[in-house]
């Protein structure tokens, strides 16, 4: 029985809205995309790395790193496309059993973290079909002028 295929999709949008060309700006003697690919190439249980992009620069970097490319259609790179449509498009255009979505805007994820995540998923596949990362927040949170996770009168 063969092992199920794991593909990492690294989304890279040409038209960054808040910080122009953020994925290619100098960062730690490299750039965000190269840092992400450097880490992912060290994780030997990943079967394929796909740079999903509308950027010629990202495609050149994908070639430099010998990883796959998926040319993103303009609509899916626009701010008009919602997250549900975007993720559906990735799923429909990625030939794999499992997708790890790993934006290059999270450059500090370590090799060991990917191994840990993949192992946790493999060990939980009978109970779940996806995993996501979360952060334990131990602060009082407010939304629209109202407390979300506590009662001020009890504090």
Residue ranges with predicted function:
Residues 3-52:
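N-terminal glycine-rich phosphate-binding loop and ensuing alpha1 helix
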Residues 53-58, 136-138:
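Short, polar loop motifs at secondary-structure junctions
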Residues 56-100, 108, 112-116:
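Short phosphate-binding loop-to-helix
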Residues 41-45, 95, 123-125:
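Short helix-capping segments at alpha-helix termini
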Residues 85-86, 98, 107-155:
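Conserved core of the sugar-phosphate nucleotidyltransferase
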Residues 13, 74, 103, 135-136:
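Histidine-centered beta-alpha loop that forms part of the nucleotide-sugar donor binding/catalytic region
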